Amino acid sequence: MTEHNPVKIEEAIRGVANQIANSVTACGDAYIAFLKADHEYDVAYAHAYLNAPGPAHGKRYDAELATINERRARDVADATYKHADRRAKALDAELRAWQSVGASVRSMYGAAGRGES
């Protein structure tokens, strides 16, 4: 078991806080990439649908097949964003856990006294 002391806990809290700050950028970038891929898929689908011959129900399937690469790119961008978001939430939970450990250690140090007689 690891011995916790206030200095190590503060270092851990600072490290997690820095990771959270970096995850904001990662989440933002991933979401922007998802929105771009989603828009590209919508536009490609609309063009494919309009250019497909035949009845409406057939156009839908033709458009789906014609835009499979755009759909795949959108799905990958969506998964990337969701992963970044879950990572940010996990870091937030880790920060709260370290704060709880810090409170326990401070309480333990406070209960030990200051060496007064």
Regions found by a protein language model. Give the residues of each.
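Short, glycine/alanine-rich amphipathic alpha-helical segment
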Residues: 51-80
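Extended alpha-helical coiled-coil "stalk/arm" regions
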Residues: 27-59
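Short, charge-rich amphipathic alpha-helices with coiled-coil/heptad character
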Residues: 1-24
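Long amphipathic alpha-helical coiled-coil segments
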Residues: 34, 75-105
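Acidic, low-complexity, intrinsically disordered peripheral segments
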Residues: 102-117
